[in-house]
Amino acid sequence: MHNVVFVLGPPGSGKGTICAKIQENLNYVHLSAGDLLRAERQREGSEFGALIESHIKNGSIVPVEITCSLLENAMKACGDAKGFLVDGFPRNEDNLQGWNKQMDGKALVQFVLFLSCPVSICIERCLNRGQGRTDDNEESLKKRVETYNQQTFPIIEHFEKSGLVREVKSERPVDVVYADVEKVFDAANKK
């Protein structure tokens, strides 16, 4: 059974940055749903490439079966990890139900790391980060933030009711945010 930490927050809240530090220091493997989807979109001969491309361009959410399959395959490929950081997933109710159906008995959600950050800071970070992502433009960002507010935030509220959410305010400097994140992991691993 794989240990999983879902890492959620608005676009530009620092999910990738914090996950890289956790992976480097705490022996968790970072699996970005978005990166897996972008890689699959680029993969020669991918049966899902065009479909993924259209969802990414529209700022909409890729069908859950595709994302879960990519996550499951990635976990199998590095099975000896202490746990997995699943970044940017689940993003809506459909994702959550699909995960529960497909990963039941295969993965245990330890907790949800919620990186909260004001939207104005998130948008500014995305526009300045220079990752060359096709969806890091103002129009796509506004759609992504709207999608996050309407669909992803209710998922965080769902996990909150189960007592699984650990919120860290991520508008602060990276080292300060990471120090708080490390405390969350220390507390979770003592249980």
From Swiss-Prot:
CDD domains: ADK
Phenotype of gene-disrupted mutants: In contrast to its homolog C29F7.3, does not confer resistance to 5-fluorouracil.
Oligomeric and partner information: Monomer.
Domain remarks in the Swiss-Prot or TrEMBL record: Consists of three domains, a large central CORE domain and two small peripheral domains, NMPbind and LID, which undergo movements during catalysis. The LID domain closes over the site of phosphoryl transfer upon ATP binding. Assembling and disassembling the active center during each catalytic cycle provides an effective means to prevent ATP hydrolysis.
Keyword Nucleotide-binding attached: yes
Originating species: Caenorhabditis elegans
Record localization: Cytoplasm; Nucleus
Cellular component terms per the entry's GO annotation: cytoplasm; nucleus
Residues annotated as binding CMP: 95
Requisite cofactors: Mg(2+)
Co-factor: note: Binds 1 Mg(2+) ion per monomer.
HAMAP family: Adenylate_kinase_Adk, Adenylate_kinase_UMP_CMP_kin
Reaction catalyzed: CMP + ATP = CDP + ADP; dCMP + ATP = dCDP + ADP; UMP + ATP = UDP + ADP
Family: Belongs to the adenylate kinase family. UMP-CMP kinase subfamily.
Tissues expressed in: Expressed in neurons and the pharynx.
Protein name, UniProt field: UMP-CMP kinase 2
Role this protein plays: Catalyzes the phosphorylation of pyrimidine nucleoside monophosphates at the expense of ATP. Plays an important role in de novo pyrimidine nucleotide biosynthesis. Has preference for UMP and CMP as phosphate acceptors.
Any one GO BP annotation for this protein: UDP biosynthetic process
Keyword Nucleotide-binding among UniProt keywords: yes
Entry binding sites for ATP: 12-17, 129, 172
Listed PROSITE patterns: ADENYLATE_KINASE
MF annotations from Gene Ontology: (d)CMP kinase activity; ATP binding; CMP kinase activity; dCMP kinase activity; UMP kinase activity
UniProt cross-references to PANTHER family, sorted A to Z: NUCLEOTIDE KINASE (PTHR23359)
List of residues binding a ribonucleoside 5'-phosphate: 38, 60-62, 88-91, 133, 144
Keywords from the UniProt entry: ATP-binding, Cytoplasm, Kinase, Nucleotide-binding, Nucleus, Pyrimidine biosynthesis, Transferase
